[in-house]
A protein has these predicted regions:
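Charged, compositionally biased interaction regions
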Residues: 1-198
């Protein structure tokens, strides 16, 4: 190896991302492990597990079978050892795609009662890389943080009276798009002209 030049700058411009800034897809393998953990500990009828922001948010979709089923899934997932830096755990019903952040947020906005659907776990173990641990706590060896458990499922005890979701299936959506394509494209062009977007 031959070194011909070394370049140096006193105040470099670094185009990197801050710690834990999402760089892309979450680690799929960890969510497979969370799903296996749920099943191993008796949480049945899980229909999907996914995460966002490098897994800091874990979403569990399930078909509720009994009162407390969603809470059981949340507590079990929060106790998963490899989930050390995961902070937010959300359960959604099986009609929500856990890989679609818009659907998850919609469920949170329409099915969560902040007074009764959210629980905080204090002093949960975390990794020494977790930026939320203060320097004083880190020095004392206190590697604990809180975790938020969010039940974004329809309330089990009155789910039959809960308003139904009104959603087109993908097949119905394609039929409408095919039938009305010209009109939809004209409307989109008008909208972009009004907003100044080209």
């Amino acid at each position: 190896m031959r070194i011909q030049r070394i370049y140096h700058r006193k105040n470099p411009i670094i185009n990197g991302a801050p710690p834990l800034r999402p760089l892309g897809w979450s680690n799929i393998q960890i969510f497979v492990q969370v799903w296996e953990h749920l099943e191993r500990w008796g949480v049945s009828d899980v229909t999907g597990v996914w995460g966002f922001f490098n897994g800091l948010i874990t979403v569990i979709a399930l078909r509720q079978r009994y009162a407390g089923h969603a809470k059981q899934a949340l507590i079990t997932a929060a106790g998963f050892r490899q989930g050390d830096m995961k902070t937010y755990y959300v359960t959604v019903d099986e009609d929500i795609d856990p890989t679609n952040l818009n659907e998850v947020l919609w469920a949170m906005c329409t099915r969560v009662d902040p007074a009764s659907s959210i629980d905080i776990i204090r002093d949960a173990w975390t990794a020494d890389l977790d930026p939320r641990v203060s320097p004083a706590r880190r020095e004392a060896g206190d590697l604990t943080v809180g975790r938020m458990l969010i039940n974004a499922c329809r309330p089990f005890t009155w789910r039959d009276q809960f308003p139904k979701s009104n959603v087109f299936s993908s097949e119905e959506r394609k039929l409408v798009e095919t039938k009305w394509r010209d009109l939809l494209e004209k409307a989109a062009k008008k909208r972009s002209a009004w907003s100044g977007v080209s």
